[in-house]
Regions:
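PLD/PLD-like phosphodiesterase catalytic module centered on the HKD motif
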Residues: 1-221, 225, 229, 339
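SF2 helicase catalytic motif II
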Residues: 312, 323-354
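Walker A/P-loop
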Residues: 235-259
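Hydrophobic positions in the central parallel beta-sheet of the AAA+
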Residues: 49, 130, 307-309, 333
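Hydrophobic residues on the short alpha-helix immediately C-terminal to a glycine-rich phosphate/catalytic loop
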Residues: 65, 231, 255-262, 349
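Conserved RecA-like ASCE P-loop NTPase motor core of nucleic-acid helicases/translocases
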Residues: 52, 256, 265-272
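Conserved helix-turn-beta segment of the N-terminal RecA-like "Helicase ATP-binding" lobe
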Residues: 266, 273-299
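Conserved two-lobed SF2 helicase motor
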Residues: 303-319
Length: 354
């Protein structure tokens, strides 16, 4: 499955222009930390974030503003924790995938000291400001969760601002490890979803239900994000084929739909009609298009952008020829349940579409 982008929904249903230095969450949207952070990111020349954990739901909310900040030349540093595995690998992959190496992303790396700070620092041309309080980066913590956060500047309280900022710099430069590709793979491989993470996810889901009855905006989630990053890296290295092996429930069909979004002509091959129909619905949701058709016993559609084909039909010699499809017609091909490819018809399809 996939999920919707709550930040976009919030912007649609409630445009906030209210400014406050004390943010407490709850039912009053004016008290959401998210709105104040978003406004600060939009103006900042550089951004420093230190939180004990990152969750995918919160990262998704801030990605748009952070991306725009990078495009105008802002510097971004993020220091987070890896204790107890509360930081989700998908949140880190999302930052790396969407924002690239422009963000200096690090883990706190002292094993004998706890790490529970939550602070957001923004530096402008003439001054700096600092948010400090209880909110890590999760959807509920940025919106309706009961969180207490306070904002002040280096003009209103220069002494304490310098204490906090200098401590951040020391932790970032002297007590951290860079989250490069190798470190991220290691963290992801050893990661097990902690029990407390389930509670945090539940809060996010409840917050999501309260926000809107909007039409879902489908986005990758969890292991899908990690897989998409791996597929993109594989293509960057010159590979033209990839095998995705994932547990039941990951949402492999949605994953294929997300990965196909930048390709004009897509072929999805499966051995059962039920799978083809379900896949068509998933691709329709992700690509937001009705430009798809079926190639099976009842239909021989050849003119749509996305074709869902039965292996029993397409795999016949009668149809694997230029009267139906040129060998290079499709720019993206998905073979569902590839372990069936030992079947002669599957192999014929794979060999034909080079």
């Amino acid at each position: 499955m996939a999920e919707r982008n709550t930040a976009e929904e919030l912007d649609d249903v409630y445009e906030i222009k209210y400014s406050t230095d004390a943010m407490t969450g709850g039912a009053d949207k004016r008290m959401y930390l998210y709105y104040q952070l978003a406004n600060s990111i939009k103006k900042a020349d550089s951004v420093d974030i230190i939180v004990s954990f990152l969750m995918e739901s919160g990262v998704k909310m801030l990605l748009g503003e952070l991306d725009n900040a990078l495009k105008r030349g802002a510097k971004i540093r993020i220091l987070t924790g890896n204790y107890l595995g509360i930081t989700q690998p998908s949140a880190l992959y999302l930052i790396k995938h969407k924002l690239g190496e422009q963000v200096d992303l690090r883990f706190y790396n002292e094993k004998n000291r706890s790490f529970h700070p939550k602070s957001y620092m923004f530096h402008y041309k003439d001054y700096s400001e600092l948010y400090i309080g209880s909110s890590n980066i999760s959807r509920s913590a940025l919106t309706s969760g009961i969180e207490w956060n306070y904002r002040f500047s280096n003009k209103t309280d220069p002494i304490n601002y310098e204490k906090f900022y200098n401590t951040f710099v020391d932790l970032f430069e002297n007590h951290s490890i860079v989250i490069d590709d190798e470190e991220l793979k290691k963290y992801s491989k050893n990661w097990h979803r902690p029990a407390v993470s389930k509670d945090l996810d539940r809060y996010d889901l409840q917050d999501d239900k309260e926000i809107s009855n909007q039409i879902p905006l489908f986005e990758p989630r969890g292991a899908q994000i990690e897989a998409l990053c791996a597929l993109e890296n594989t293509r960057a290295e010159g590979a033209r084929r990839a095998l995705v092996q994932a547990a039941t429930g990951v949402g492999k069909t949605y994953l294929a739909a997300f990965d196909s979004k930048n390709y004009e002509r897509v072929l999805f091959v499966a051995h059962r009609e039920e799978i083809l129909k379900q896949a068509a619905e998933s691709f329709k949701n992700v690509r937001d298009s009705d430009d798809y058709g079926f190639f099976n016993g009842d239909s021989k559609c050849t003119e749509k952008s996305v074709i869902f084909a039965s292996v029993a039909t397409l795999g016949r010699v009668d149809y694997l020829n230029e009267n139906y499809f040129e060998p290079d017609y499709f720019t993206y091909v998905v073979i569902d349940e590839f372990h069936h490819a030992v079947n002669e018809q599957y192999q014929r399809i794979v060999d034909y579409f080079k």
